[in-house]
Amino acid sequence: MSTTQAMSLGLIGLGVMGENLALNFERHGFAVAGFDLDADKRARFDERTQGLQARSCTSLAELVASLSAPRRILLMVPAGAAVDAVLAELRPLLSAGDVLIDGGNTLYSDTARRIAALQGSGILYLGMGVSGGEEGALHGPALMPGGDAAAWPLVAPMLQSIAARADDSEPCCEWMGPGGAGHFVKMVHNGIEYADMQMIGEAYWLMQEMMGLSPAQISAVFREWNAGELGSYLIGITADILATTDPLTGEALVLRILDTAAQKGTGKWTSQIALDLGAAAPTIADAVFARTVSALQPERVHASKH
């Protein structure tokens, strides 16, 4: 492929999510120029996209120069300081009318701050929630864009083309609103997921401790639930997990794992904002506290012995 071909989209951050999104865009006819500081990730990207229009770039300047105007650049980097660092390096390379999209799990107020910082530059900024994990990124995520309204017509066709489809065939991608609206919606989405996972965990505990069911029997219950109105990704993978056995001992793998759960912060943010707004979200808050207690495994073990 000629390296002078104008590319449709720049993608910064070539982890699994970024890679899979790039393949999804390519499948829908959008040529992707990718960049990552990690040379190994760039090499893997070139390997996975061999035969496609996509290619990696060795610098942000090369990536920006490869894009057709107005430039559209999607950031898939860790939320926080990494986003600010990329923006600081990108800003001098961009022109009025270019569009930046932050696809990470960014706090919505950080997105609003970045939009304000770009006011007057003509650079358009979007904060976009991306849901569906690695498989969703590859086959069809749910996308929640918000920010500069002027950017939406410039990116809507490509974003809606790669998004998952609802039962009525409408794309799972629509404009959420100004400022940090897109990331706010994703934050609440993740908070609800915290509550869902806590309810699944408590259902498992009740069946195991109160009813005496084995993990295999509980798996069968979850599989039955997944065939009805409770059917969902989380219920389905729970059934699969509970049916998995440890190859070394033959017993249920769930009985061999450490009983601690980490968290990335979106559930906490949702709970904090609910308190600020006076919105009742006790199930989400309790799910966050349950994870906090879960993470205190040494303290729990000590307390159980004294």
Residue ranges: model-predicted function:
Residues 254-306:
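A conserved active-site cap/scaffold subdomain adjacent to cofactor or substrate pockets
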Residues 84-86, 107-220, 227-256, 293-306:
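Rossmann-fold dinucleotide-binding core
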Residues 59-126:
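Rossmann-fold NAD(P) dinucleotide-binding segment
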Residues 20, 43, 195-198, 261-268:
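Short acidic alpha-helix initiation/capping motifs at coil-to-helix transition points
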Residues 28, 121, 277:
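Conserved dinucleotide-binding and phosphotransfer motif residues
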Residues 32, 56, 124-126, 281:
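Hydrophobic beta-strand scaffold residues
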Residues 2-72, 97, 134-137:
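NAD(P)+-binding Rossmann beta1-loop-alpha1 motif at the extreme N-terminus of oxidoreductases
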